[in-house]
Amino acid sequence: MTTSGALFPSLVPGSRGSSNKYLVEFRAGKMSLKGTTVTPDKRKGLVYIQQTDDSLIHFCWKDRTSGNVEDDLIIFPDDCEFKRVPQCPSGRVYVLKFKAGSKRLFFWMQEPKTDQDEEHCRKVNEYLNNPPMPGALGASGSGGHELSALGGEGGLQSLLGNMSHSQLMQLIGPAGLGGLGGLGALTGPGLASLLGSGGPPASSSSSSSRSQSAAVTPSSTTSSTRATPAPSAPAAASATSPSPAPSSGDGASTAASPAQPIQLSDLQSILATMSVPAGPGGGQQVDLASVLTPEIMAPILANADVQERLLPYLPSGESLPQTAEEIQNTLTSPQFQQALGMFSAALASGQLGPLMCQFGLPAEAVEAANKGDVEAFAKAMQNSASPEQQEGDGKDKKDEEEDMSLD
């Protein structure tokens, strides 16, 4: 079972309307690799991808005859790639290739028709690398909307401006959009706690993003059968895989003007499926995830005062100790790094200005957020540090100068 990669879902919208309990499923058999040759296992099988209640994505294979699930792998974004093996004579052999290490799993298609093979392959890669928002599959009515559905350029600003502070906290807090949805996914403990405007977030019932989930074996179900002859197993093929070809997906969706006043629930649904656009070019694009690296954060996290301020924001639970070591583990985890990258992208989009204004941030920070200038926003936040902190920094600098004069 693979446990590397990022846990937080992506903000890329997609077609998630299937009522099936599996995100995608298709009939396929396994293949065994010996040396450089793969040999088909002639059993009837089913490949499916499932998102469990803990939001983890499982790639599974089960025997359709016995109902036994033989492979149940937890996959994180960018862990692996599913692609066709062109060396196979039948052209219907696919490989799940892990980017870290040499692990590869081969499958041969057992669907009677070939016209959906590439579509199944595309969907597998989409769901493995862009998991849907928790609860997005069950949502109805407003899925697929974009911000343009708010009714013009000023729609979002107008809606946010008329919200109370409690409504904003409901929207972007840790419980606002299912714990991991919308803007809550961008910030982990919630945007308010990240910006320092408010107390520590409430304890979440979700497990730590670094915890390993046990393999989930779904109840055995009998897959639907068709009165068509079963496809024949492919001949043994070479397992040599070519370099991955770039895949492309059409994530465009049609926006429609709302027929009635927009409610808070509508905005929540929109944010849960919105795609973060490119920044308007107000400043140089900065990816916070590439700036706040473990090497840069290490000396900062070694400061006892910093540790004391961060401890209340750690995930709480019986198996989650709130220690300085846990701070280090949290901030250096792939999950936190991806969440930081998502927040950086949202900030660079220039759409978070109204939210920053609602939280009473300095005018410089709001202006930078409106422009999508991440670097200017960070500088504005640094300049707006509490007077006590600035006084302490000034005192330390003065002491250093006095020590130098004594030398």
Swiss-Prot record:
PTM annotation: Ubiquitinated by UBE3C in response to proteotoxic stress.
One Gene Ontology term of the molecular function aspect: proteasome binding
Region annotation Interaction with UCHL5: where it falls in the sequence: 362-407
Cross-link Glycyl lysine isopeptide (Lys-Gly) (interchain with G-Cter in ubiquitin) residue location(s): K34
Compartments reported by the entry: Cytoplasm; Nucleus
Phosphotyrosine: residues bearing it: Y127
Domain spans labelled DEUBAD: 277-391
Pfam families linked to this entry: Rpn13_ADRM1_Pru, RPN13_C
Keywords: Acetylation, Cytoplasm, Isopeptide bond, Nucleus, Phosphoprotein, Proteasome, Ubl conjugation
Protein's job: Component of the 26S proteasome, a multiprotein complex involved in the ATP-dependent degradation of ubiquitinated proteins. This complex plays a key role in the maintenance of protein homeostasis by removing misfolded or damaged proteins, which could impair cellular functions, and by removing proteins whose functions are no longer required. Therefore, the proteasome participates in numerous cellular processes, including cell cycle progression, apoptosis, or DNA damage repair. Within the complex, functions as a proteasomal ubiquitin receptor.
Similarity field: Belongs to the ADRM1 family.
Protein's recorded name: Proteasomal ubiquitin receptor ADRM1
